[in-house]
Amino acid sequence: MNELLIKAEQLQQAAKTLALLSTEEKNEALTRIAEALIKQKEWILQENEKDVALGKEQGLSPALIDRLQLTNERIEQIVDGVRQVADLPDPIGEIVEEWTRPNGLRIQTIRVPLGVIGMVYEARPNVTVDAASLCLKTGNAVLLRGSSSALHSNKALVHVMKEALRDSAIPADAIQLLEDTSREAAQQMFRLNGYLDVLIPRGGAGLIRSVIENATVPVLETGVGNCHIFIDESAQKQMAIDIVLNAKLQRPSVCNAVETVLIHQNWPYISELVETLHARGVELRGDSQLASSYSFIQQAAETDWSTEYLAPILAVKLVQNVKEAVDHINRYGTKHSEAIISEQNDNVRFFFQAIDAAVLYHNASTRFTDGEQFGYGAEIGISTQKLHARGPMGLRAITTTKSLVYGTGQIRS
């Protein structure tokens, strides 16, 4: 039996124990994990630096290096996420519905764990801890498969978490890392029916497509983020500039960063916006009108409208009205996060009704599409599909339900 099957068997057994634990037992284990991560922070950073150095040698893009790199601040954010998950209400056992039939049968629908979750992700070590904490809180065991570029970091994080669990009620086997990062091992993982209850891919378009096309295990799809902001004719100048700068520059390498800004052609502050972006080092790719009006704006190609740059690059386009903006977003968007900056309620209402996306914003940055920002604690991913879960996926997104039927001897006639 190879490494993967051994770990899958261990996960199955651990999931059975996890499903029976109390909220207090799970929270105590999460607190131990948070404390251990802080205690082992320097070692984790040393292991992460090995990955970062190797990534630079191999020519990883600045965006990927940024996602890969851990810092003191980022580890503290990860630990805060674990503690927040411990503080959140436990959805397991929650009564979703309850009713009594005319024949006296009392029926309850309650939340239960999914079982064993397989996480497939790229160079994001924070996902290792985020996924583990959310899974443990909801009584799920988790098989983690990160990228080879983050292997030192992931091994360190999983080691610290497993050691922290050894003195808790949660079996250490409830967290497993697939250290074989080969394509063959990944393909085997995608077909672990009977061991894994669901796969959750979290990463770029290529990774997600690979999982969807090759998996026989059910997939809970997360999506890439070609996010848009539409600046309406009535948008306040400083609000619009501040939101666009935040959505593009606060952290360009993440999926909720804005990639295209659509501007109403009659908005009076177009020059101020594009000149501010240019001064802040953003490479602008615009439609023919903008490219001919500003020497620092490159002519956009058709592919620019559908590109998730994950870098300080922004596509910009003038539109005649909110309908043209909506049509553009529905054509090129990835159903992730879309925003309108406007003081016209009718336009906001139309934007919200007409756009097919997981999260829509009025007068706010797209950067808020995040489990922690939504109050979920850490997130397992951001779903852009419509079945089971959509948007930032917190605790409830990785549960399912079962029905409990209480009778007094009823038989069906």
Swiss-Prot record:
Pathway assignment: Amino-acid biosynthesis; L-proline biosynthesis; L-glutamate 5-semialdehyde from L-glutamate: step 2/2
Recorded catalytic activity of this chain's protein: L-glutamate 5-semialdehyde + phosphate + NADP(+) = L-glutamyl 5-phosphate + NADPH + H(+)
GO CC entries: cytoplasm
Lineage: superkingdom: Bacteria
InterPro entries linked to this entry: Ald_DH/histidinol_DH, Ald_DH_C, Ald_DH_N, Aldehyde_DH_dom, G-glutamylP_reductase_CS, Glu-5-SA_DH, GPR_dom
E.C. number: 1.2.1.41
Gene Ontology process terms (BP): L-proline biosynthetic process
Entry keyword ATP-binding: no
CDD domains listed in its UniProt record: ALDH_F18-19_ProA-GPR
Class of the enzyme per the UniProt entry, highest EC level: oxidoreductase
Locations listed in the record: Cytoplasm
Keywords: Amino-acid biosynthesis, Cytoplasm, NADP, Oxidoreductase, Proline biosynthesis
Pfam family, one: Aldedh
GO MF term (any one): glutamate-5-semialdehyde dehydrogenase activity
Family in the record: Belongs to the gamma-glutamyl phosphate reductase family.
Job of this protein: Catalyzes the NADPH-dependent reduction of L-glutamate 5-phosphate into L-glutamate 5-semialdehyde and phosphate. The product spontaneously undergoes cyclization to form 1-pyrroline-5-carboxylate.
Classification via PANTHER family: DELTA-1-PYRROLINE-5-CARBOXYLATE SYNTHASE, GLUTAMATE SEMIALDEHYDE DEHYDROGENASE
Protein name, UniProt field: Gamma-glutamyl phosphate reductase
Organism this protein belongs to: Geobacillus sp. (strain WCH70)
Phylogenetic classification of the source organism: Bacteria, Bacillati, Bacillota, Bacilli, Bacillales
